[in-house]
């Protein structure tokens, strides 16, 4: 068995699941992704911060995306508006393949991580204040200058995974892990030992005029759930994405059908 397939994940991008070990996703992630996404106001509250980015980056649409100005020999980063120290959080990064260049790094950072340097580099993950995945090279960076950085996910045959335009970042501050998912498949923890910090969504980029979007998908706190809530998760899991449209045909009261569909 390969990585964990997520309910609600897109299957448009195939992943070589047989190459990687069996890695279970964080508790509550499937539930988080099955729930209705936050509204536009919440998206902007969790979006890119125009006051916390490189001077070569312009944040647009209230934080929904940024554009990097075409400045030579500069690596530029941006941080999200909200930092997370508790709970499970997930957000989607959209970054066109043709706009990545030599160093396109996605991850998290503390408020102290630098957001600009005067050369091309994997800025995110270059010191102790940030953690990042170079989605072009497939390398993980933390306190790293590049050489010897581990590959992610760690394939058994040395094959590098092609990262599509959209990927999920999964930050579990209850367990202290950071991981990623693509094509509806969770790839496993990339980093551990993150408890006790406040971490912000972050990226660093080198491509002139690249546009990087962020879409916050929600939060789940570690707390007991009601039997009704757990029953809904069980029913949705057994139906699967392809059969959720058949809820209306189930022998259930209308109110229960609406509850199953988060309506």
Swiss-Prot record:
Compartmental location: Cytoplasm; Cytoplasm, Cytosol
Keyword Cytoplasm: yes
GO cellular component terms, semicolon-separated: cytosol; SCF ubiquitin ligase complex
Coiled-coil residue spans: none
Region named Disordered: 1-48
Sample GO molecular function, one term: ubiquitin-like ligase-substrate adaptor activity
A single BP term in Gene Ontology: ubiquitin-dependent protein catabolic process
Record function comment: Substrate recognition component of a SCF-like ECS (Elongin BC-CUL2/5-SOCS-box protein) E3 ubiquitin-protein ligase complex which mediates the ubiquitination and subsequent proteasomal degradation of target proteins. Negatively regulates nitric oxide (NO) production and limits cellular toxicity in activated macrophages by mediating the ubiquitination and proteasomal degradation of NOS2. Acts as a bridge which links NOS2 with the ECS E3 ubiquitin ligase complex components ELOC and CUL5.
Name of this protein: SPRY domain-containing SOCS box protein 2
């Amino acid at each position: 068995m390969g990585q964990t397939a997520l309910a609600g994940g897109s299957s448009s991008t195939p992943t070589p699941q047989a190459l990687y070990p069996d890695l279970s996703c964080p508790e509550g992630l499937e539930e988080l992704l099955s729930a209705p996404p936050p509204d536009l106001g919440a998206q902007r509250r969790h979006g890119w911060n125009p006051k916390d980015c490189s001077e070569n980056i312009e944040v647009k649409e209230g934080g929904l995306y940024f554009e990097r100005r075409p400045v030579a020999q500069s690596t530029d980063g941006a941080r999200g508006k909200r930092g997370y120290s508790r709970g499970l959080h997930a957000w989607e990064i959209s970054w066109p393949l043709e706009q990545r260049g030599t160093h396109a790094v996605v991850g998290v950072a503390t408020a102290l991580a630098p957001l600009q340097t005067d050369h091309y580099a994997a800025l995110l993950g270059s010191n102790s204040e940030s953690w990042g995945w170079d989605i072009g090279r497939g390398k993980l960076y933390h306190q790293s200058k590049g050489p010897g950085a581990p590959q992610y996910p760690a394939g058994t045959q040395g094959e590098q995974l092609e990262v599509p335009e959209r990927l999920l970042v999964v930050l579990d501050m209850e367990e202290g892990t950071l991981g990623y998912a693509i094509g509806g498949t969770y790839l496993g923890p990339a980093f551990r030992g993150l408890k006790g910090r406040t971490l912000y969504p972050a990226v660093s980029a080198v491509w002139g005029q690249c546009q990087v979007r962020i879409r916050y998908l929600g939060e789940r706190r570690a707390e007991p759930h009601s039997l009704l809530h757990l029953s809904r998760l069980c029913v949705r899991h057994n139906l699967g994405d392809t059969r959720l449209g058949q809820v209306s045909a189930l022998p259930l009261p209308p109110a229960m059908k609406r509850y199953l569909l988060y309506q």
